[in-house]
Amino acid sequence: MQAAARAGADAIGLVFYPPSPRCLSVDWARQLASEVPPFVSTVALFVNPAAAEVYTVLERVRPAMLQFHGEDSAVFCAQFGVPYLKACRVKPDVDLLEYLRPFSGAAGWLLDSHVEEYGGVGESFDWSLVPAERSHPLVVSGGLSSENVATAVRRVRPWAVDVSSGVESSKGIKDPAKVAAFISEVRNADV
């Protein structure tokens, strides 16, 4: 986390999805969040959570933003009174704007790969499926690494990018050199 902040990350994701090797306990996440430097945000990531779980994280970890993957409704996502990103798993037969329309209260929309499991599997999606017309800031995720993120930024022109497995040395373990290379590629492409 410190390596990401030093390299220039704008936000640090804290995963609260038990099947993920990146999942954090609330206590560990609270400790990590307390070490995040000023001007770097924390984002709590959930997949189909119970409301009580989200409230616990909000109370104890105090993330700046929530990120919802899964089948959560717009009403569910908005009930916490905290800015949130709604994720959409992209595939050719999904009308992204139609899928995301109910989430007009979201701070932004995160576009991710449509794969069997959630999160950090290293597969990208066809960026040509991203609509040119947008009503919300877009975050691109899914299969990004230092090798392809510059292309994604140039093609999609997202508000932000989100990375996990693309900067890991092994599942759940971030590699500081890969993190720095990724952020450098993003900055070089975003001109």
Description of each model-found segment:
Residues 1-191:
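Conserved N-terminal beta1-alpha1 strand-loop-helix module at the mouth
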